Amino acid sequence: MKILVVNCGSSSLKYQLIDMTSEEALAKGLVERIGIEGSILTQKVNGEKYIIEEPMKDHKKAIELVLKALVDKEHGVISDMSEIAAVGHRVVHGGEKYASSVLIDDEVMKALEDCVKLAPLHNPPNIIGINACRELMPKTPMVAVFDTAFHQTLPDYAYMYPLPYELYEQNGIRKYGFHGTSHRYVSSVASEMMGKDLKDLKVITCHLGNGASLCAVKEGKSVETSMGFTPLAGLAMGTRCGDIDPAILLFMERELKMSPDEVDTVINKKSGVLGISGVSSDFRDIEGAAEEGNKRAKLALDVYHYTVRQTIGAYTAVLNGVDAIVFTAGLGENSAASREEILNGLEYLGIKIDAEKNKQRGKQIEISTEDSKVKVFVIPTDEELMIARDTKEITAK
């Protein structure tokens, strides 16, 4: 059984064709600059690159070229489109309606449209991608896998904001959380590595990329997470501010005469470690600058590590203890220095790190010592595989 996994952005599209017998990706690809001059599709099969450069006016044209690349006689991996048993779509926001992945039909599409107001940047391209696939592959079942779904198990006191209750009732203003597919995947792998049932464990998962969030997992369920109504909340990130005093936004508008759009640009695109360092949103650049004596770069890293450490401490309280901490995503998987700094100060939990093991980059590994009371893992995330597994399970029913 082969499943196509699609992740549509506003001008890009990532895809993988996964053989579910071996759970291996037969092909991985990226389409860039959709609707912009210089559109390009890059597909990788067994390390070999295949590139298509031609105009792609919309996502439908992009998906046409994806299917063309997959069945290409020389560079493709399937002989016919009928080999694609189902398509799994990453959808950022499922609102309160969806606590798990779902088979797509017209009713689901309407619900996704209703969620656009909650994710105006992300849901529209997700919907466009689904519509294009449904048009080009009308007989192939489609499944929506939501970033928010895993966090629908948060208790009401964890997701409710202390605002007038009517704002929740009438406008859906509450904590939703994101990166759910990643948190779900790495927590399940951690339990496998420990040889225990996830339902018997308390796990804190740290998805640390340009966007970053933490999740507290208890009895296999998300009970707390750092992102909120939007992916702006929580930790300091690459370009996002994370949690700040909300009155700062009013100050920016009233005193600095900034428009709501200007404020939005500042808190979403000009803040985080980029804003503090003035160097970059790329942690490799900031680490390099800090090593060369750039004080603002060092401060940016200190603030970032502090917000992660602070949140791990809070989630240990939420869980009433912790059995395992997992690092994943770009920074979590690849920066030994950041992992060390984040855990520095959590010795009271009985965490002991093996310095040699911690030097490993991008590999699935336990980095805690044998006598560490809390297991610490680095687990490369695989959201595409999780989407494919959900798609297989739902279409098999």
Swiss-Prot record:
Compartment(s): Cytoplasm
Annotated site residues (Transition state stabilizer) in this chain: 179, 240
Free-text remark on how the cofactor is bound: Mg(2+). Can also accept Mn(2+).
Binding residues annotated for ATP, in chain numbering: 14, 207-211, 282-284, 330-334
Pathway: Metabolic intermediate biosynthesis; acetyl-CoA biosynthesis; acetyl-CoA from acetate: step 1/2
Key word Metal-binding present: yes
GO cellular-component term (any): cytoplasm
Entry-linked InterPro entries: Ac/propionate_kinase, Aliphatic_acid_kin_short-chain, Aliphatic_acid_kinase_CS, ATPase_NBD
Residues annotated for Mg(2+) binding in this entry: 7, 383
Record keyword Protein biosynthesis present: no
Alphabetical keyword list: ATP-binding, Cytoplasm, Kinase, Magnesium, Metal-binding, Nucleotide-binding, Transferase
UniProt main location, coarse: cytoplasm
Active site, renumbered: 147
Family annotation (NCBIfam families): ackA
Annotated family: Belongs to the acetokinase family.
PANTHER family membership: ACETATE KINASE (PTHR21060), ACETATE KINASE-RELATED (PTHR21060:SF15)
Quaternary structure annotation from Swiss-Prot or TrEMBL: Homodimer.
HAMAP family documented for this protein: Acetate_kinase (MF_00020)
Protein name: Acetate kinase
Species assigned in the record: Clostridium botulinum (strain Kyoto / Type A2)
